[in-house]
Amino acid sequence: LDYYGLMHRTQRLIAIASVVAGLIPFGSAQAVAPAPVTNSDLNAGLMYQILVAEMSAFNGDETNAFSLTLDAARRANSPRLYERAVELALRVRSADFALEAARAWQRGFPSSKDANRYILQILIGTNRLSELTEPLKRELQGLSGKDRVGTINVLPRYFQRVTDKALAAAVLEQALAADLPTTLYGPAAWSAVGVMRIGAGNLPGALEAAQRGAALDANAEEPAVLALNLMDAKAPAAEAIVRKYLTGNALPEIRMGYGRALIGAQRFAAALTQMQLINTQKPDFADAWLVRGSLEIQDKGPAAAEKSLKQYLSLLPAEQDPNDETETGRGAVQAYLLLAQIAELNGKPDEANALLQRIKSPQDALRVTVRRATLMARQGKLDEARAAIRNAPERQADDARTKLATEIQLLRDYKQMSEAYTLLTTAVQTYPDDNT
């Protein structure tokens, strides 16, 4: 018998039992100033029961540990013991036991948000959606103002993994019945219902939810965001909700979302107007300058686009040492590529090359190399251009094929037909199944 090992394990279990019982705060590894003495509700018998429960859990008998812990929780009316009972039940994947403990916890502490969230998680995890109405109502109990709106907004996330999305939408609508007709909470509540209806594939129902939410308050953000999502889902009537919202004191993020939706619909002039409005209303909103510059290349010309793109870059955090290998952000990559394109159009290949060299992005490395190689070829440096392409790192599965195709095209563009044919023959032998 390993006496010292047994004593060490027993002392550890006593410590765990004390923490679970709430006698010792978590993380109390060092001596601290004495706290005021408070009498524990636990007597010696309950302490012994908790210790036995922890020993059972330590030895793999979680079922017995659960029963002992739940009994102790009821007798001591201890939130920490109730939570421990839930944890033990979940450890053995017993949803029924976990739900029993969580509901007992809630009966003992009706206002406990932790107990209610365990109940929600267990019911959702076991697809017992019809039992969720009351727990959802309790999640909102006692909340008002922004706290209530914020909680309503996150409720749809609880249902991301449920299989019956239509039932989930109906349950949430029932739980929010008291909020739906109100001016203060109705827009958020209807939008939450609309999000659930989108998940269920009910686009007409989602549009109705957006319309009802906006009817309560046309300046509310939630129906406008829902309507934006419906625009992406090809529901044209949703645009009227967004446009009405944008006539007020609109958030730039929502106007930006509308602009992107317009770009997706190839309504570029309208999208440019939205970007210009953001630039006027909130000049430090960087992304609007980037999108504006991207649109102006096609519409207003290189000079206007260059000004917008440089304004975008000026709003980003200051660049570090040029030798710093910190990866360039996605927006900055796009801006540098567009500015390099403008420099090429203006007949400034050296400036274009310098802009491309500022991009430090592994995923764009080949793309940037191809652009730089094209610049070299235009300056009569075809051999250097080919060498740059061949030496470019290969990070994706198709990069080798892309490099070969790019080099062939470069040779064709500069009338090196013999070398292009030789390289094409190599490509056909290397990639016999490639019909491109």
Q: Which residues make up each language-model segment?
A:
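Short, intrinsically disordered or compositionally biased N-terminal tails of bacterial proteins
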Residues: 1-7, 323-324
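A composition/secondary-structure signal for short, hydrophobic, low-basic-content segments
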Residues: 4-7, 26, 45
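ATP phosphate-binding glycine-rich loop
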Residues: 62
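Bacterial N-terminal signal peptides that target proteins for export
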Residues: 5-17
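Boundary at the C-terminal end of the N-terminal hydrophobic targeting segment
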Residues: 29-34
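Alpha-solenoid helical repeat scaffolds
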Residues: 37-58, 67-436
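Intrinsically disordered low-complexity regions specifically enriched for long asparagine
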Residues: 26-28, 433
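Bacterial N-terminal signal peptides
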Residues: 15-25
